[in-house]
Design a protein with these regions (language model features):
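Flexible, active-site-proximal loop/turn residues at the rims of small-molecule/cofactor binding pockets
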Residues: 67, 82, 113
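Acetyl-CoA-dependent GNAT
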Residues: 1-70, 74, 79, 92-93, ...
Length: 152
């Protein structure tokens, strides 16, 4: 397994990004999916990683710098062929390590609720993320929730 900054021009990376965005839109009430598309992930304040296993893109994840020592975890997605292998947990650790190296003191994320989101929520909570207040432009709803991890 290799975790490295992603080449957003790579067709396999683009396909997993598109799959993630489609799944988030399909599994969220109208107007409550905030998954970034390829152009959003290309923003200079966003870093995107890809995990490769046997030369296949197994997962992606991104970190968006928010300023003031804060950053947002974005676009975490494991390809269906690679689920339940611990890949997402290793990718999450790599992103957290990078955040620390950038002097980030709080890492936040916004996600949905319900069965489709339970595996991701379990991963984040196991790593120490806790539910909290909305951040940025997000608004908490019956569907959306925000989680935070203090980095020291």
């Amino acid at each position: 397994m290799i975790i490295a900054l992603a080449d957003l021009g790579d067709a396999d990376v683009q396909a997993l990004i598109a799959f993630h965005q489609q799944a988030m839109q399909a599994g969220s009430p109208p107007g409550l999916s905030f998954a970034l598309d390829l152009s959003g992930l290309a923003d200079p304040v966003v870093s995107v990683w890809a995990v490769r296993v046997d030369d296949r893109v197994a997962a992606i994840g991104a970190l968006k710098l928010l300023g003031g020592g804060q950053a947002e975890l974005k676009s975490m997605r494991t390809h269906p062929d690679f689920l339940r292998r611990g890949i997402a947990a290793q990718l999450l650790e790599a992103i957290i390590d990078h955040a620390r190296s950038q002097a980030i003191t709080r890492l936040s994320l916004e996600t949905g609720g319900g069965p489709a989101f339970d595996p991701a929520l379990a991963l984040y909570r196991k790593r120490g993320f806790v539910n909290g207040a909305a951040f940025g432009d997000y608004v908490l709803t019956d569907f959306n929730q925000c989680l935070h991890l203090t980095l020291v």
